[in-house]
C-alpha cells in the first residue's frame, strides 16, 4: 500500500516584512494500524541575492490515538535549511540547498537540488532530488540509513491564491523498510495557500 499524505488541510502561508510563515497539518494513512497526524510551522526568508533560510518546528498527535488530529501533542523534532536560488531568467530557477532535521533519536542530513520553470500564466512545474542520510546517535547499534528521494510539483498561482500538487518517491539504498516492509515509499500531497499580506 502506498502512503497518502495530505498536507495543508488547513494550512496557509503569508508574507510579513519579506518573511514567510507556513502552517501545515498532515495526515498520513499508512494502513489500518498506522495512521498519524502531524503539524508544523516554518519561518523562512529569501534575500535579494538569492540566499534563503528557514527554521521549522514540528509536533504530532501522541498518546493512545495518533490517528486523532490535535490529540496529546508531543514534540516531533525541528528542521533548518539554507538555500541559494539562481535565476537564469524570469521563468527558470535552480536552487541547491542543505537541510538538517533532528529529534531526540536521530539526525537527517539532506543535501538537495531543485529546478523550477514558471510559465507566464501562473502555472509552474518543479523537480527536486534529495539525498537523506540518517544517523541514530542515541542508538549506537542501529545502522545509518541512506535514502534517494525525488519530488515533482505542479502548481498554479492566481492572485493571492496558490495551489500545488506534489508527488514524492523515496527509496532506501540500505534496504530499510519504509512502507509495508518495502524499501521505498510514495506520497501524494496537496497544498493550498493564501497570501495575507502583500
Short names for language-model regions:
Residues 162-198:
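Outer membrane beta-barrel transmembrane domains
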Residues 25-31, 57-63, 98-104, 129-135, ...:
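Transmembrane beta-strands of outer-membrane beta-barrel pores
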Residues 41-45, 80-86, 113-117, 129, ...:
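Residues on the lipid-exposed face of transmembrane beta-strands in outer-membrane beta-barrel proteins
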Residues 16-67:
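Short glycine/proline- and aromatic-enriched beta-strand/turn motifs that initiate or cap beta-hairpins
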Residues 35-39, 43, 74-80, 107-111, ...:
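Residues that define the transmembrane beta-barrel architecture of outer-membrane proteins
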Residues 19-22, 49-55, 87-96, 121-127, ...:
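Repeated loop/turn-to-beta-strand initiation elements of outer-membrane beta-barrel proteins
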Residues 27-29, 66-70, 100, 112, ...:
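Extracellular loop and loop/strand-boundary signature of outer-membrane beta-barrel proteins
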Residues 1-20:
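Cleavable N-terminal export/targeting peptides
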Amino acid at each position: 500500500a502506498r502512503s497518502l499524505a495530505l498536507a495543508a488541510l488547513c494550512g496557509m502561508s503569508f508574507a510579513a516584512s519579506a518573511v514567510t510563515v507556513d502552517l501545515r497539518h498532515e495526515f498520513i494513512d499508512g494502513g489500518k494500524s498506522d495512521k498519524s497526524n502531524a503539524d508544523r510551522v516554518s519561518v523562512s526568508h529569501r534575500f535579494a541575492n538569492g540566499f534563503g533560510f528557514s527554521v521549522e518546528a514540528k509536533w504530532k498527535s501522541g498518546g493512545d490515538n495518533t490517528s486523532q488530529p490535535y490529540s496529546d501533542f508531543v514534540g516531533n523534532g525541528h528542521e533548518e535549511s539554507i538555500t541559494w536560488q539562481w535565476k537564469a531568467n524570469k521563468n527558470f530557477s535552480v536552487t541547491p540547498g542543505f537541510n538538517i532535521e533532528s529529534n531526540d533519536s536521530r539526525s537527517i542530513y539532506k543535501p538537495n537540488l531543485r529546478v523550477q520553470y514558471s510559465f507566464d500564466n501562473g502555472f509552474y512545474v518543479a523537480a527536486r532530488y534529495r539525498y537523506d542520510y540518517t544517523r541514530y546517535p542515541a542508538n549506537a547499534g542501529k545502522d545509518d540509513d541512506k535514502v534517494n528521494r525525488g519530488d515533482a510539483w505542479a502548481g498554479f498561482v492566481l492572485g493571492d491564491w496558490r495551489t500545488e500538487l506534489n508527488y514524492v518517491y523515496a527509496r532506501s539504498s540500505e534496504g530499510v523498510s519504509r512502507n509495508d516492509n518495502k524499501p521505498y515509499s510514495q506520497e501524494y500531497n496537496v497544498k493550498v495557500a493564501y497570501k495575507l499580506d502583500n
